[in-house]
């Protein structure tokens, strides 16, 4: 980032509360739609990415995030695509970390595929990042190559080790895929818990065309949990995060296991989050086509008055819940945009 002076947050800006009384305190920002993997459940192999000129600059992303922090966001997650492939992205992390220092922000974190972690883990830790999520669906090199199409498992594992060595807490996110990795979930859990890492399982989400039918990938996590219960003691944990995951403690490993089930059990009633794309589009719901342009008001004025008005309008229309569905009759994705654009 350049040394340009950022617009200071509006002092005393009001909190963001939607029509259903949910206060927005968690912002997820996709800083790029590009990725060095082509995961089969996320995008097609010949994915066409956005022109670079369409993306917000790092300075604009900083200003946008800061405006939301001034409105009550306490947790900020940077996503992609793969956030660590964006040029100079660490300058954005370093700049945003000032909000940790002032106490305006409780947590600055990111979700990554791990491919670039060995390069950036130490710097992330130095910037005040304390924990990260790593997307990893298998420990089998052949399956990993098949799922990611372009990925190198050894490089990801080295990145995870570098993150742990830098003092970052790591949580593994794994998408459960029918007839691909569902049989490997117990061993993936044992591996993660053995290293002191949590594991969260995620159902396939119907976002964007991927060149394959998602019904052939989908396995309900209720079935996965039932299978695990045959060999492990799963004790429900209280919901303390306000997020989409439902957690259990696995008595035999002492580790924590999460289930994100948008299709079999939605998580809308306690939703406290919104998403911003790398082009400045605000999505107040992952599973709806709602969209509000924040780039125009961001660029229209050096102060945040127009931006805050646009944010208020968008939050005022946040829907009660999503419309995710996967079945043979509805084989097209429920939502046209890709997760890589929305932010994973």
From Swiss-Prot:
HAMAP family: MoaA_B (MF_01225_B). It comes from Rhodopseudomonas palustris (strain BisB5). Pathway: Cofactor biosynthesis; molybdopterin biosynthesis. GTP binds at residues 28, 77, 111, 171, 273-275. [4Fe-4S] cluster 2 binds at residues 268, 271, 285. Binds 2 [4Fe-4S] clusters. Binds 1 [4Fe-4S] cluster coordinated with 3 cysteines and an exchangeable S-adenosyl-L-methionine and 1 [4Fe-4S] cluster coordinated with 3 cysteines and the GTP-derived substrate. It catalyses: GTP + AH2 + S-adenosyl-L-methionine = (8S)-3',8-cyclo-7,8-dihydroguanosine 5'-triphosphate + 5'-deoxyadenosine + L-methionine + A + H(+). Gene3D superfamilies: Aldolase class I. It comes from the Bacteria. Its cofactor is [4Fe-4S] cluster. [4Fe-4S] cluster 1 binds at residues 35, 39, 42. GO terms for biological process: Mo-molybdopterin cofactor biosynthetic process. This is GTP 3',8-cyclase. Catalyzes the cyclization of GTP to (8S)-3',8-cyclo-7,8-dihydroguanosine 5'-triphosphate. Monomer and homodimer. Keywords: 4Fe-4S, GTP-binding, Iron, Iron-sulfur, Lyase, Metal-binding, Molybdenum cofactor biosynthesis, Nucleotide-binding, S-adenosyl-L-methionine. Its EC number is 4.1.99.22. Belongs to the radical SAM superfamily. MoaA family.
């Amino acid at each position: 980032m350049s040394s340009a002076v950022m617009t200071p947050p509006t002092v005393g800006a009001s909190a963001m509360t939607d029509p259903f009384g949910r206060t927005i305190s968690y912002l997820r920002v996709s800083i790029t739609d590009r990725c060095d993997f082509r995961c089969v459940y996320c995008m097609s192999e010949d994915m066409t990415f956005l022109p670079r000129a369409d993306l917000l600059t790092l300075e604009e992303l900083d200003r946008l995030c800061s405006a939301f922090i001034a409105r009550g966001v306490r947790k900020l997650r940077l996503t992609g695509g793969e956030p660590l492939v964006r040029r100079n992205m660490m300058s954005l992390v370093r700049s945003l970390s000032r909000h940790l220092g002032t106490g305006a922000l409780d947590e600055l974190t990111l979700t990554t595929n791990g491919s670039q972690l060995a390069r950036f883990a130490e710097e992330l830790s130095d910037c005040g990042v304390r924990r990260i999520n790593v997307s990893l669906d298998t420990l089998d090199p052949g399956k990993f190559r098949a799922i990611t199409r372009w990925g190198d498992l050894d490089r990801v594992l080295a990145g995870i080790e570098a993150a742990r060595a830098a003092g970052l807490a790591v949580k593994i996110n794994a998408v459960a895929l029918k007839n691909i990795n569902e049989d490997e979930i117990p061993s993936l859990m044992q591996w993660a818990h053995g290293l002191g890492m949590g594991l969260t399982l995620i159902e396939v989400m119907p976002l964007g065309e991927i060149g394959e039918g998602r019904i052939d990938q989908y396995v309900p996590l209720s079935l996965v949990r039932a299978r695990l219960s045959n060999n492990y003691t799963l004790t429900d944990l209280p919901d303390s995060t306000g997020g989409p995951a439902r957690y259990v403690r696995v008595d035999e490993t002492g580790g924590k296991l999460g289930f994100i089930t948008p299709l079999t059990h939605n998580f809308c009633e306690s939703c406290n989050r919104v998403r911003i794309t790398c082009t400045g589009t605000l999505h107040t719901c992952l599973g709806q086509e709602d969209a509000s342009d924040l780039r125009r008001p961001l660029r229209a004025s050096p102060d945040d008055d127009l931006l805050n008005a646009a944010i208020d309008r968008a939050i005022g229309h946040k829907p009660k819940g999503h419309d995710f569905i996967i079945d043979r009759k509805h084989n097209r994705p429920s939502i046209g945009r890709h997760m890589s654009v929305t932010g994973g």
